[in-house]
């Protein structure tokens, strides 16, 4: 049997990619508070951390507009985005949301 040595950083990255899907129990909107999400609306995409809900608005902190996600599987699994612009705080009309996907990566801090 052959053995391959990898750095701790590489091991953690592989372990995270091969690990079980995180179970997210969402029963009401407030369960999203504190979660990092990739949100697709009818016209654009954002990533950010849910801060609160006000009426029909979802407030994101550390939000970024995703102009081009690149290959979608890579964006979700690896956190790689082809074109992204950090914008800070953002409010989203929840009626415009098409889908929401957990974001397991650091939120973008640099324009790309």
Predicted regions and their residues:
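Conserved RNA-binding domains used in RNP assembly and mRNA/RNA metabolism
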Residues: 3-112
């Amino acid at each position: 049997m052959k053995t391959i040595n990898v750095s701790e950083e590489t091991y953690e990255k592989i372990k995270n990619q091969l690990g079980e899907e995180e179970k997210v129990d969402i029963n009401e909107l407030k369960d999203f508070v504190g979660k990092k999400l990739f949100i697709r609306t009818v016209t654009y995409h954002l990533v950010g951390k849910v801060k609160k809900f006000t009426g029909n608005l979802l407030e994101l902190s550390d939000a970024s507009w995703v102009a081009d996600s690149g290959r979608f599987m890579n964006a979700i699994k690896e956190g790689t985005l082809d074109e992204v612009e950090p914008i800070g705080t953002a409010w989203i009309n929840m009626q415009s949301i098409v889908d929401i996907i957990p974001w397991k990566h650091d939120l973008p801090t640099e324009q790309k």
